[in-house]
Amino acid sequence: MVRTPLTPEERERGERLGQLLREARGGRSMADIAGVAGISAETLRKIETGRAPTPAFFTVAALARALGLSMDEIVVRCALVPAA
């Protein structure tokens, strides 16, 4: 199965998600947050740096729980602002 290329909007949304997760993580280590979320630190690193801009829903949900974020907050903070 061939994966279709990501759109610029999907890449931007992934970058916003990564930035939000980095901010929410603060001084806590990637390994600590990844462990609580049940994912690898490498997966978290890829999401935070935009190398995995479209993570699975349950991965995002687990990270939200580990970081004390609501899914609503993630949606609002990662939503694209329409061009004027």
PLM regions and their residue ranges:
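Short, solvent-exposed alpha-helical "recognition" segments
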Residues: 51-56, 82-83
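Short alpha-helical DNA-recognition segment
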Residues: 26-47
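Short, charged recognition helix plus adjacent turn
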Residues: 1-4, 75-84
